[in-house]
Amino acid sequence: MNELDSLVATARAAFAEAKTPAELENAKAQFLGKSGRITELMKGMAALSVDEKKSRGAAINVAKQAIEAALTERRQQLADEELSLQLRAEALDVSLPGRRRIPGGLHPVSRTLERIEEIFSSMGFDVADGPEIESDWHSFTSLNNPPNHPARSMQDTFYVDLNGDDGIPYNLRPHTSPMQVRYAHQHIKKYAAEFAAAAADATGTVKAPEIRVIAPGRTYRVDSDATHSPMFHQCEGLWLGENVSFKDLKVVFTDFCRTFFESDDLVLRFRPSFFPFTEPSAEIDIQFASGPLAGRWLEVAGSGQVHPNVVRNMGLDPERYIGFAFGMGPDRLTMLRYGVNDLRLFFDGDLRFLSQFQ
């Protein structure tokens, strides 16, 4: 074996011993680098004759090509080994049982709110929205709640450490009624020309668009037990016009309940009550038709004819505009619809419970 063949064999052995790309590059420098063996051989031809240079140079190039081929081959081997290790590390054991993917769905209370909105929208009601942090005026004063009303106490209402323009702290709205007041103001502003024309018409034939709206949303009160939560949902409704009566309230709410509970035979009663924002006022009860509670009544809503002071605070003349309002708890309707006895179960976040309603 001549010198060049021995050099090629030595290079192949050095490349084979390299276990990483970095080691391979170090081995390459020994043979193909600027100070490598091949470079030294090329420099050694300086003293040779022209014919000897030609012959020697050709032989060295053959050896160089053989070393480069060995280097390329080893690089590919190392790359293949690295890929193989990576594939083994990322391999999937198809014999392992798969992880169950539980499909998500709407919360039962969200389903109830959607159903309420769909039913009232089909009756021509708009759906209002509004802030959950409210001023004292919107939460109480505008709704004919006097300053000494129990609802204003710290024991019943959550207050925020920030005062409004009136110097009274803001509150977490205890009901969604403020949304109705805000909606009424926006409605009157939107149809200002129509309301002005109706007010100027002495014949009474010009009518402004009626206010017909529901206000669903989260509300907050200092209360927590099996049937109450500090955060709960409420949906209030308002219908104001020039010829809206208590009869319309009975028709609308009866139709709603029968549609919601999918029972054309559902019996409702309107029981006299008191609310500062309606006069006259009534509690609305439904009767159980079957089961152990058959024949018994359950309160589902409060209602009444809107108090003149509230109509006035909405920006309308109570001598001309009249209407009704109602308020109900979607959480309680959800409990009734699904037969759940503890309201807190809906808000504990237990997927074992909530998945039953998907």
UniProtKB/Swiss-Prot annotation:
Its cofactor is Mg(2+). It comes from the Bacteria. GO terms for molecular function: ATP binding; magnesium ion binding; phenylalanine-tRNA ligase activity; tRNA binding. It is found in: Cytoplasm. It holds the Pfam family tRNA-synt_2d. One of its GO terms (biological process) is phenylalanyl-tRNA aminoacylation. Mg(2+) binds at E279. It catalyses: tRNA(Phe) + L-phenylalanine + ATP = L-phenylalanyl-tRNA(Phe) + AMP + diphosphate + H(+). One of its GO terms (cellular component) is cytoplasm. PANTHER family: PHENYLALANINE--TRNA LIGASE, MITOCHONDRIAL, PHENYLALANYL-TRNA SYNTHETASE. Belongs to the class-II aminoacyl-tRNA synthetase family. Phe-tRNA synthetase alpha subunit type 1 subfamily. Tetramer of two alpha and two beta subunits. This is Phenylalanine--tRNA ligase alpha subunit. It comes from Variovorax paradoxus (strain S110). The lineage of its organism: Bacteria, Pseudomonadati, Pseudomonadota, Betaproteobacteria, Burkholderiales. The gene is pheS.
